[in-house]
């Protein structure tokens, strides 16, 4: 009986490992991006902390921005904007529900290659109860923090597509160099949205 249980457990492990199953909230970061520089205008801000946390969860080693290594990819966090749109109103015309939209822009610089812009958008609903002002502010702060975490997850999930775009542009570059003697300048493509 014990042998059968061990055999079934081993079989279950092999099947899940063989089919590409992985833990939730983890991304297969390309091996060329396992060591990276995180560059941000606000290194201790909520987005920087969320991205740093997601990179570490996915096994990426972060180097200092001031490092002398120039062969390491760099993730540069750009502008973050949060917009609030009215989703519904009460009978008296006051706003009952907001839809909050967070847009995050970033770029990945691969040395000797190209700069790849990426972006992430996160949507959340927020109920506005005018009778509970303090609770409303606390809830809004929690929602914004969660939005930063989701935006960081989306940015990290786009790293494999950057690697694929880099490989594709290399293939296009080699095919154009063999077909024609003169090659046009490389144009980066926008990933996401």
From Swiss-Prot:
The keyword Lipoprotein applies. It is a lipid-anchor. A lipid is attached at residue 19 (N-palmitoyl cysteine). A lipid is attached at residue 19 (S-diacylglycerol cysteine). Coiled coil: none annotated. InterPro entries: LPS_assembly_LptE. GO terms for cellular component: cell outer membrane; transporter complex. The keyword Signal applies. Residues 166-193 are annotated as: Disordered. Residues 174-186 have a biased composition (Low complexity). Together with LptD, is involved in the assembly of lipopolysaccharide (LPS) at the surface of the outer membrane. Required for the proper assembly of LptD. Binds LPS and may serve as the LPS recognition site at the outer membrane. Component of the lipopolysaccharide transport and assembly complex. Interacts with LptD. NCBIfam families: PRK10796.1. This is LPS-assembly lipoprotein LptE. The gene is lptE.
């Amino acid at each position: 009986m014990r042998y059968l249980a061990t055999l079934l457990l081993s079989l279950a492990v092999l099947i899940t490992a063989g089919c590409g199953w992985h833990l939730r909230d983890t991304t297969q970061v390309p091996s060329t991006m396992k060591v990276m520089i995180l560059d941000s205008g606000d290194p201790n801000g909520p987005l920087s902390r969320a991205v740093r946390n997601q990179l570490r969860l996915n096994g990426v080693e972060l180097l200092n921005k001031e490092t002398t290594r120039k062969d390491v990819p760099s993730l540069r966090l750009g502008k973050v904007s949060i917009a609030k749109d009215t989703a519904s109103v009460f009978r008296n015309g006051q706003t009952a529900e907001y839809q909050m939209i967070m847009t995050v822009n970033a770029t990945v610089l691969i040395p000797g290659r190209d700069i790849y812009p990426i972006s992430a958008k996160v949507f959340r609903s927020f109920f506005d109860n005018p009778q509970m002002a303090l609770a409303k502010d606390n809830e809004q702060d929690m929602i914004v923090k969660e939005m930063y975490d989701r935006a960081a997850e989306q940015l990290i999930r786009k790293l494999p597509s950057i690697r694929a775009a880099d490989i594709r542009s290399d293939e296009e570059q080699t095919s154009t160099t063999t077909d024609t003697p003169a090659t046009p300048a490389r144009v980066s493509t926008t990933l996401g949205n």
